[in-house]
Regions:
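Extracellular glycoside hydrolase catalytic/binding regions
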Residues: 72, 84-253
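Aromatic-rich peripheral "rim/lid" segments of glycoside hydrolase catalytic domains that contact
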Residues: 234-305
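Anion (oxyanion) recognition and catalysis
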Residues: 8, 15, 198, 259-260
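Short, solvent-exposed turn/loop segments enriched in Gly/Ser/Thr/Pro and often Arg
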Residues: 26-33, 143, 268-274
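Aromatic- and acidic-residue-enriched segments that line the glycan-binding/catalytic groove
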Residues: 29-48, 91-98, 221-226, 287, ...
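An active-site-proximal structural segment forming one wall of the substrate-binding cleft
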Residues: 1-28, 37-77, 124-126
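A structure-centric feature marking long, well-folded core domains of fungal metabolic enzymes
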Residues: 4, 28-31, 63, 67, ...
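A cross-family glycoside hydrolase active-site/sugar-binding cleft signature
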Residues: 22-26, 77-79, 138-140, 163-165, ...
Length: 305
């Protein structure tokens, strides 16, 4: 497992300072989503190759064996963002994330929910061999949050958490109006309602979210695309600080209220390495950085009475 020594260090730090770790297997050979975060843009063939599926299962076993009884372990997430048909089409993945190696990308396509169900069940069995029941096995919803109501209902499945990733850029791609009212209504009607509904079946965490949105960027980002996708961003500030603050505080409050219907949430990410001041096309992308959001007072740091 690459860089496993660094993960060893992370556990030592976590246990020293009273933190807990959710290990997330973020990529799979031949890609599980075709996104840039899947390791190979435009390539999504992992689930079609039984040998690679088995390899991922053995990696999960090794992780569970190495860290399953560590005090600092909260749980293991089986796989990050395995894409299914709806988001594959919504994002038009082959064009949004064009493959460098066209031959390698040939035959790429979304994973099926039927495959993910079988894979998750096998992964659970492999992980639980080495991990106590009080540690969590986390499964991603494949971007279809309400599709799992009848899944893992048997008594053998203990402490399974359902992870959903909800970004306003995805709401925009789905047709959400790029206004404060548009965002807050979408969050309430979709994120909040669906999380509350699914909490009846699993503990639900929003494993990725942020304040990023096109309105605060001052331009339509086409669902969160950037200069890396060939979409030019704003070249100069189009909003005042007060206007930005109003937008970000409104979407922060709406989203935090939605996540309260579930069992937890993780902001993505704590730190953004992109220089939004000196690099062209990145105005408005500070909101991916939680530290900057707190510094700029976009993110509430105290609960309201």
């Amino acid at each position: 497992i690459g860089c496993v020594e660094e993960l060893d260090k992370a556990f030592n730090w976590a246990e020293k300072y009273g933190l807990q770790i959710l290990i997330d297997l973020h990529t799979a050979p031949e890609g599980q989503n075709g996104f840039d975060n899947g390791g190979i843009c435009g390539v999504c063939k992992w689930s079609k190759n039984p040998e690679e599926v088995e390899f991922v299962l053995t990696v999960l076993e090794r992780l569970a064996k190495r860290y399953g009884k560590r005090k600092g372990l909260w749980g293991i997430e089986v796989l990050n963002e395995p894409i299914t048909e709806s988001v594959w089409e919504l994002f038009d993945v082959p064009n949004r994330y064009p493959a460098v190696d066209k031959e390698m990308a040939a035959g790429s396509g979304p994973n099926t929910l039927a495959f993910l169900r079988i894979f998750y069940q096998e992964a659970y069995d492999r992980i639980r061999k080495y991990m106590p029941k009080e540690k969590y096995v986390v499964i991603h919803d494949g971007f279809v949050l309400t599709a799992w109501k009848d899944f893992m209902r048997e008594e053998k499945y203990v402490d399974v958490v359902l992870d959903t990733h909800q970004y306003l850029m995805m709401a925009e791609a789905a047709g959400c109006e790029q206004t404060i009212e548009g965002y807050t209504c979408f969050v309430k009607e979709h994120y909040e309602k669906e999380i509350e509904e699914m909490e009846k079946y699993f503990p639900v965490i929003c494993g990725e979210w942020c304040l990023f949105n096109s309105l605060a960027c001052g331009c339509d980002t086409k669902g969160g695309q950037s200069v890396l996708n060939g979409v030019d961003g704003a070249k100069e500030e189009r909003l005042t600080l007060d206007e930005k603050n109003e937008i970000y505080r409104a979407v922060a409050d709406a989203q935090l209220q939605a996540w309260q219907k579930g069992s937890g949430y993780f902001y993505w990410s704590y730190k953004l390495l992109t220089d939004t001041v000196n690099e062209n096309g990145w105005l408005g992308w500070d909101s991916w950085d939680l530290g900057r959001c707190v510094d700029f007072k976009w993110f509430p740091t105290q609960k309201k009475n």
